[in-house]
């Protein structure tokens, strides 16, 4: 079994947080949605191209949320849910972010501020970014080719011809920290990454494949390493554009640890001891995964302590 320890508490993953109830029962209730939109307590998140306005305060980085009467009158509305106080939240997607008089507000995306936001704000932005991207790429029916229109408060697209309903796409992907008999960790690097950047291996689940099978297949395809038993650790949405990262810990089979990279997805792969990783990071020769990614948390489980801070990439 993997030498990566099991955790008693869920991992604190930056993009796997939320502070609202998605309240799916209201998505097709047009009178309720209209009343919620016009309520003075309702807050609206303008979004464009995966970015929203944020402001840096003494309490931290926060989303700029507008009362609905101050929000732009054009754009696509997505109902995001309600909080414990009954406040409703909507996203408003447009071609560009609206102009603002507040000079402190700045546009930012999830990669930049996802880990800095509160649980509520992180959940709102992840939800909004995922929906915005899906709507932008699914304007036509995959059955008949006719245009589709938004329905279900932004959570459905319905064909204007054949009435087929299409739902937001989520692509399951496995990401894994693999160890060997010497308790070394397998990390890889892609050719397009910054020099010195290393991370855990990952890949999409294929049709007709279990997630455990996907872990073993991806590791063998990318690095030539054969994997035995694996254990689920945690998951995190990764809306770049539509992935759900399923985190695992696994152990390489004895005699199956020789590395042969595929040369396509990975340019290099390597087994690291804790001492090697620590020395490489201290020398600036190894850059660990960014704090927003589940990869960083998987490596930290094996490493036994937080990794040093790293720049966004």
Regions found by a protein language model. Give the residues of each.
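Short beta-strand micro-motifs in enzyme catalytic cores
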Residues: 76, 88, 155-157, 172-174, ...
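Active-site lining segments that contact anionic ligands and/or coordinate catalytic metals
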Residues: 227, 233-235, 243-247, 266-267, ...
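Active-site-adjacent beta-strand/loop module that shapes the phosphate/pyrophosphate-binding cleft
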Residues: 236-260
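Cys/His-rich short segments
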Residues: 127-179
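Conserved hydrophobic/aromatic beta-strand scaffold that supports enzyme active sites
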Residues: 79, 140, 175-177, 187, ...
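The catalytic Nudix box helix
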Residues: 199-233, 248, 254-256
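Nudix hydrolase/Nudix homology domain
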Residues: 1-138, 149, 193-198, 263-313
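N-terminal strand-loop-strand
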Residues: 157-199, 204, 226-227, 250-252
């Amino acid at each position: 079994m993997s030498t990566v320890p099991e955790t008693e508490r869920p991992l604190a993953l930056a993009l796997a947080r939320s502070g609202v109830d998605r309240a799916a029962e209201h998505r097709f209730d047009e009178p309720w949605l209209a009343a919620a939109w016009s309520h003075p307590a309702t807050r609206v998140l303008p979004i464009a191209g995966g970015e929203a306005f944020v402001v840096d305060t003494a309490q931290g980085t926060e989303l700029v949320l507008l009362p609905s009467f101050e929000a732009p009158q054009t754009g696509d509305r997505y109902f995001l849910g309600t909080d414990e106080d009954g406040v409703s939240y909507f996203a408003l997607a447009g071609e560009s972010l609206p102009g603002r008089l507040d000079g402190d507000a700045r546009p930012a995306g999830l990669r930049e501020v996802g880990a800095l936001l509160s649980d509520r704000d992180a959940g709102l932005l992840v939800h909004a970014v995922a929906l915005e991207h899906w709507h932008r790429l699914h304007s036509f029916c995959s059955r008949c080719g006719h245009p589709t229109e938004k329905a279900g408060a932004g959570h459905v697209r319905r064909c204007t011809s054949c009435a087929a309903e299409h739902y937001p796409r989520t692509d399951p992907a496995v990401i894994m920290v693999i160890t060997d008999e010497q308790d070394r960790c397998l990390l890889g690097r892609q050719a397009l990454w910054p020099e010195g950047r290393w991370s855990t291996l990952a890949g999409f689940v294929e049709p007709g494949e279990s997630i455990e099978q996907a872990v073993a297949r991806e590791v063998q395809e990318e690095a030539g390493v054969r994997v035995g038993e694996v254990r689920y650790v945690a998951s995190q949405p990764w809306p770049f554009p539509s992935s759900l990262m399923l985190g695992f810990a696994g152990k390489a089979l004895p005699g199956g640890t020789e590395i042969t990279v595929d040369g396509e997805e990975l340019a290099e792969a390597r087994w690291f001891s804790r001492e090697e990783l620590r020395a490489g990071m201290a020398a600036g020769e190894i850059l660990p995964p960014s704090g927003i990614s589940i990869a960083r948390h998987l490596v930290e489980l094996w490493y036994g302590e937080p990794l040093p801070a790293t720049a966004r990439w």
